[in-house]
């Protein structure tokens, strides 16, 4: 398990590597990466050989993206290289199925940086760069466009961007030439309800549905996906209590496609909401809420076996481990908590030795 974190805007221990036991749900620290600033979002390559991290997020200067080679036997990371992201505050990394192309969402300078990766995991210089303008109705959060994340469709033929500031989902057609070089072509944007603030998104494994977590409205939006088009189906409240302001954060679907989870930040909330998924029509049914036993659950992950869910509580500096009931979707907290200052991103991979 790989943990990214905020280092309080100064060099520090930004990435932690743990060995996670998929029988007991216990974790043991293997290694750390020091002297990096705000390695706040991580993404594994599809083959598990490389780890990519945003660096220097939430600063007044351009952020960077770093590539690391993973030694899965020792649990060590070796820096391969870094590249400038071309904008401030990179918030998210997406990788296509081939592992050859990276999309970085820059939040403060609303833009998308598109990179190619070579066969050694090294990131080449920016291949394509797109900027965005726009605004929304929520003062402060929506004074300008804010690209928070991106997702390739399961067929790798479209890329969808969540624009928290403009209340829309930007769509790009993915083009591959004869040499398998990828380029992006801007297509229509999908407008969402004013004041929603789309943040993260996930596609269902059946390829028919997608679900977005809206930070500012505290709702999960369900969409039908057909021929690259997203059609809005319904909104579902993610919070258990009414709030003056909402701060929903992350969203994931269990490996078996039966349950959807989303994290909610905020006073008297800090919870994971649990929904069951109707695979025939994409509808969600509320199962319940589970407290995260910490403050500000920015990110969470379901382990590849589907038996555990782990939550990174950024403000309380702890990672909480839950055993997941695969039949009911409900969560049960385990005794062990991991202490990681500013924990903000989790990535998991099963290595066979």
Swiss-Prot record:
Alphabetical keyword list: Carbohydrate metabolism, Cytoplasm, Glucose metabolism, Hydrolase
EC number(s) recorded for this UniProt protein: 3.1.1.31
Catalytic reaction(s) noted: 6-phospho-D-glucono-1,5-lactone + H2O = 6-phospho-D-gluconate + H(+)
Induction: By ulvan and rhamnose.
Alphabetized SUPFAM superfamilies for the sequence: C-terminal (heme d1) domain of cytochrome cd1-nitrite reductase (SSF51004)
Gene Ontology terms describing biological process: glucose metabolic process; pentose-phosphate shunt
Subcellular location: Cytoplasm
Pathway recorded for this protein: Carbohydrate degradation; pentose phosphate pathway; D-ribulose 5-phosphate from D-glucose 6-phosphate (oxidative stage): step 2/3
Cited function: Carboxylic ester hydrolase that may be involved in ulvan degradation. Ulvan is the main polysaccharide component of the Ulvales (green seaweed) cell wall. It is composed of disaccharide building blocks comprising 3-sulfated rhamnose (Rha3S) linked to D-glucuronic acid (GlcA), L-iduronic acid (IduA), or D-xylose (Xyl). Catalyzes the hydrolysis of 6-phosphogluconolactone to 6-phosphogluconate.
Descriptive protein name: 6-phosphogluconolactonase
